[in-house]
UniProtKB/Swiss-Prot annotation:
It is an enzyme of class 3 (hydrolase). InterPro entries: dUTPase, dUTPase-like, dUTPase-like_sf, dUTPase_trimeric. GO terms for biological process: dUMP biosynthetic process; dUTP catabolic process. Substrate binds at R75, S76, G77, N88, T92, V93, D94, K102. PANTHER family: DEOXYURIDINE 5'-TRIPHOSPHATE NUCLEOTIDOHYDROLASE. Keywords: Hydrolase, Magnesium, Metal-binding, Nucleotide metabolism. The gene is dut. This is Deoxyuridine 5'-triphosphate nucleotidohydrolase. Coiled coil: none annotated.
Length: 158
């Protein structure tokens, strides 16, 4: 089967975006066609010394439609180049939340301080549909090939 290089437009849904900082209007957008994550920026100066963390405001609040969730993911470039990542990745923004999206960043670089200025991209926001589970109490669970084997159960890469 050959790979189809045709770009298909992804599904879309409307998400209301409220700007909370008049100096930095809400600028949620996708950098490239096909990107899953929209850039989130900081609205304040942030300095993160090695192993320091901070809750960083983005100046953005959103209203998601029912059945959707927004996930705050790290930016791969920040992680690879500066050692900065989202502490609780991915962070969850539920559809009912209307407050400012804030990003808990941590600098995992042991030597270098990371500095961000208003307008710098600090994370990405991915919008996804989700399924709401009906949790059913059970005395026993059906068997599976994996059973109770957990951490490290698939072995170590050679």
């Amino acid at each position: 089967m050959a790979f189809d290089e045709t770009y298909n437009e992804p599904e879309s849904t409307e998400v209301l975006v409220k700007s909370l900082d008049p100096e930095h209007p809400a600028q949620l957008h996708y950098a490239h066609a096909g990107d899953a994550g929209a850039d989130l920026i900081t609205t304040v100066d942030v300095t993160l010394k090695p192993f320091e963390r901070a809750l960083v405001p983005t100046g953005v609040a959103i209203a998601l439609p029912a059945g959707y969730v927004a996930l705050v993911h790290p930016r791969s470039g920040l992680a690879a180049k500066q050692g900065v990542t989202v502490l609780n990745a991915p962070g969850t923004v539920d559809a009912g939340y209307r407050g400012e999206i804030k990003v808990p960043l941590i600098n995992l670089d042991p030597k270098h301080t990371a500095v961000f200025h208003p307008g710098d991209r600090i994370a990405q926001l991915v919008i996804q549909r989700y399924v709401e589970a009906r949790f059913i109490p059970a005395e026993t669970l059906p068997g599976s090939d994996r059973a109770e084997r957990g951490f490290g159960s698939t072995g170590v890469a050679s």
